[in-house]
């Protein structure tokens, strides 16, 4: 089975340093896609940059935890805290959505609003994933599958990082222990079955789960050396510099190092040595020749698909 690699930057739109890193990582490195937070502070800047990058696969980074909703807080009271933002506790919110039909209706309304906001950008929807992987929640999965025909959701990320890959790449024991205790860790196989039945594409494997936020060049090369067959998504959180919100995170969170890894020639060489083809979710449906032709048309201004 051939190896295909999607390299995605999450949190596109969160801040200008993130958006700058997405553009640099795509133009000068191995980054092939980005996941857009449509309600984030720098979303407008991210959208403008994405319009200049026709080969960048842009998906929706659906936010139901730790972020700003698309709907007014009074329309989704079961999902937000007193400040009008989503809760930072995914486990409590997940239980509420699972047990409450009212919360489920509110979650569907909010997801619909975010998909509608993405549609208004006129960017092609490459994929959908979830902030803090909250789309692993079975109710949220069901909502996304139900909305897929209406919004053209053709691919959804499955956060499935095999333990053998983590161990081979040298993930820390602390992170392996944390992932072993992750409440939704066993949802990935069921998620794949549900997506396959709905004819929605997904990655076979994900890389970066155990190393989220601190994948430097050495770690990225180690992950690429362990690249399995099939479709793998490597996700990262790059930025050109730290900013106010991120300063509150531990020093181990190193977005600048992740950008440096994306543009490191030794990392590109590791991709080539792995035998993998860099791609996007969209290209899994469109043959490369077709995708290249479409990109050429967009860059020449002859395609109506470009915003």
Language-model-detected regions and their locations in the chain:
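DG-centered beta-turn motif at the end of beta-strands
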Residues: 9-12
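Active-site histidine-anchored catalytic micro-motif
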Residues: 130-132
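Alpha-helical and His/Cys-centered functional microenvironments
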Residues: 135
């Amino acid at each position: 089975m051939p190896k295909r690699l999607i390299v995605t930057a999450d949190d596109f739109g969160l801040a200008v340093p993130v958006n700058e890193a997405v553009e640099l990582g795509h133009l000068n490195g191995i980054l092939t896609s980005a996941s857009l937070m449509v309600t984030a502070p720098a979303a407008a800047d991210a959208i403008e940059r994405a319009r200049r990058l026709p080969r960048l696969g842009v998906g929706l980074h659906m936010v139901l935890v730790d972020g700003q909703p698309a709907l007014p807080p009074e329309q989704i009271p079961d999902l937000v805290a007193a400040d009008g933002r989503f809760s930072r506790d995914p486990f409590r919110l997940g239980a509420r959505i699972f047990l409450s039909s009212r919360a489920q209706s509110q979650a569907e309304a909010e997801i619909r609003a975010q998909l509608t906001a993405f549609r208004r950008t006129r960017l092609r929807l490459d994929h959908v994933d979830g902030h803090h992987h909250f789309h692993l929640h079975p109710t949220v999965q069901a909502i996304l599958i139900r909305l897929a025909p209406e919004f053209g959701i053709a691919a959804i990320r499955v956060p499935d990082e095999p333990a053998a890959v983590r161990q081979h790449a040298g993930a820390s024991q602390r992170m392996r222990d944390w992932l072993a205790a992750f409440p939704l860790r066993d949802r990935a196989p069921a998620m794949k079955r549900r997506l396959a039945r709905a004819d929605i594409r997904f990655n076979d494997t994900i890389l970066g789960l155990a190393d989220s936020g601190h994948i430097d060049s050495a770690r990225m090369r180690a992950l690429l050396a362990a690249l399995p067959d099939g479709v793998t998504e490597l996700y990262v959180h790059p930025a050109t510099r730290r900013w106010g919100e991120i300063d509150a995170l531990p020093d181990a969170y190193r977005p600048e190092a992740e950008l440096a890894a994306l543009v490191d020639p030794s990392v590109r060489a590791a991709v080539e040595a792995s035998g993998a083809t860099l791609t996007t979710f969209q290209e899994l449906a469109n043959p490369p020749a077709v995708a290249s032709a479409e990109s050429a048309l967009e860059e020449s201004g002859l395609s109506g698909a470009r915003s």
